[in-house]
Amino acid sequence: MTHPDPYLRGHGDTRYRVHHYDLQLTYAVVTNRLDERARLDVEVVEPTHHLKVDLRGLQLGGATVDGAPARYRRTSGGWSVAVGDRRAGERLVLELKVSGKPRPVPGTHGEAGWEELTDGSMVGSQPQGAPSWFPCNNDAADKATYRIEVLTDAHYQVVANGTRTVCERQ
């Protein structure tokens, strides 16, 4: 079920919450190409057999649930991933392969999200921009922790909120 928040119309799914996102991104600046693997540690809140994942403008190229291949299909504003019959309180790990050329997401107060610049890119995600660059449950009440790993062209710098644990140049 889509969340009723007026700022996030069509975003979010109240049947689950994400406890942690683990994102591995590879970004080619010149072509604005993003390839990523996203791992979502999920808790089911309401009985369901599928979850709606918010992802706008990017392709889903594979999905697993607890390591087993899962069926998925495009829906309005994202993707529906089959998770089998799940009861409230169950935990699962959803892994998704994503690719494409990210772009901002339109919303009630204008566009937000991934923005391609003349020499690089930036992300401004409030309130609806997160699905422009990673698969998520875009519900402002669904708080989670994140680990983000980014591989990009050597002469670019990756900047993000949080604590940097490793910075390698190759």
Predicted features, each with a name:
Residues 1-170:
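Acidic/His-enriched low-complexity segments
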